[in-house]
Amino acid sequence: MAIKNILALVVLLSVVGVSVAIPQLLDLDYYRSKCPKAEEIVRGVTVQYVSRQKTLAAKLLRMHFHDCFVRGCDGSVLLKSAKNDAERDAVPNLTLKGYEVVDAAKTALERKCPNLISCADVLALVARDAVAVIGGPWWPVPLGRRDGRISKLNDALLNLPSPFADIKTLKKNFANKGLNAKDLVVLSGGHTIGISSCALVNSRLYNFTGKGDSDPSMNPSYVRELKRKCPPTDFRTSLNMDPGSALTFDTHYFKVVAQKKGLFTSDSTLLDDIETKNYVQTQAILPPVFSSFNKDFSDSMVKLGFVQILTGKNGEIRKRCAFPN
């Protein structure tokens, strides 16, 4: 890596508050000499898909997050298994969507620059570009990740944060990945474009403590609204995680959480910690022009993209994202 690029990356990481032991692991210009149009190719494919189906932005962002939280940002969430025991087969990942976008971007790259760009990098770029397509923030994606060869269902179950988790558990989950409480609340803000289903909220509505009760931390009016949408036996109906602003990347999610209308326990529990609560309440009342959320989200996404990465001779560059070479 050229000295100027190392310095540029160090400056970038200093600006966004990221601490990385060896800054030259990744490079903003990693593919510039061998495949200068790599990012342009990925962006073109992503725009093509997301402009037709805006809900893909949330799905691709979620996929990148789930990839990074299990064995690091190594594309292991993309791997298939003949025995259905890969990460994508774990219950939390059964609802992941958008694989076709990653595959299309990888195929386009293989035509232009074969055996060069990792699926892990493709997924990181696709997630960034998908959010940008719907008007969300754009963030720099240092490149040079390598693809993992291992993908285990149990790893996903052990590492992915649960929508039923309390704040203490979530902070521990994030700390294990080198992410702090601010990253937790900021990345939770990605739920501003999130979509879920009655299946993940049913217990909060009808059997929170095993006695047929509702979660007392929820706004009673929101409980009534959700019960109308989700009868006790309905596990399929889709729910917007940010009602009224579901396809807009903005701070409305924090207003919802501040009103005790967070869909998941993991949303509501952000009010149970001083630091995360202060962030929620601040973003909830600030006019968008004064909000730091877009920058904060960009900073935390850069940090997320460095979690347990494979570089150098570790891992491989997959030819097809669903299968190891």
Curated annotation (Swiss-Prot):
Heme b binds at H191. One of its GO terms (biological process) is hydrogen peroxide catabolic process. Disulfide bonds join C35-C113, C68-C73, C119-C321, C198-C230. Pfam families: peroxidase. This is Peroxidase 1. Induction: Up-regulated transiently by a cold treatment. Ca(2+) 2 binds at T192, D242, S245, D250. Its EC number is 1.11.1.7. The gene is PER1.
